[in-house]
A protein has these predicted regions:
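A cross-family signal for N-terminal binding/gating loops and helix N-caps
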Residues: 1-115
Length: 116
């Protein structure tokens, strides 16, 4: 049986949400992502598509891209753009698109069932 537990989410500070919120990373090609980040460096896309910090000679999957994403996220946390929830919780969400609503549940889950 799967083991799940609550966790302390890291999320944008309320006063920064409008600048940080971004569409999913996979709706942009690299060139489009660069333009979005250039227009709004606070966008989460700068972290999600950290290759936007490098020229085109750096592969999207290069280790330094992942290191840059880590650096950017840690910096956003350090300056208070992201906050950590004080108490662990489960998270429930609803997404609506084209009149169809999808509900979800977010929690920490053990990987033990996948290792067997």
């Amino acid at each position: 049986m799967a083991t799940i537990r609550m966790f302390n989410a890291v999320r944008p500070a309320i006063e920064k949400v409008d600048r940080i919120a971004a569409l999913p990373y996979d709706v942009y090609n690299r060139k489009e992502a660069v333009e979005v980040v250039k227009g709004n460096p606070d966008s989460f896309l700068a972290i999600d598509r950290a290759e936007t910090s490098f020229d085109d000679s750096v592969d999207t999957y290069d280790d330094k891209v992942y290191a840059k994403a880590k650096e950017l996220l840690e910096n956003k946390i350090a300056v208070g753009d992201f906050v950590t929830e004080e108490a662990p919780m489960y998270y429930i969400y609803a997404l609506t698109m084209d009149g169809r609503t999808q509900h979800g549940f977010v929690a920490c889950a053990s990987i033990d069932d996948y290792e067997n």
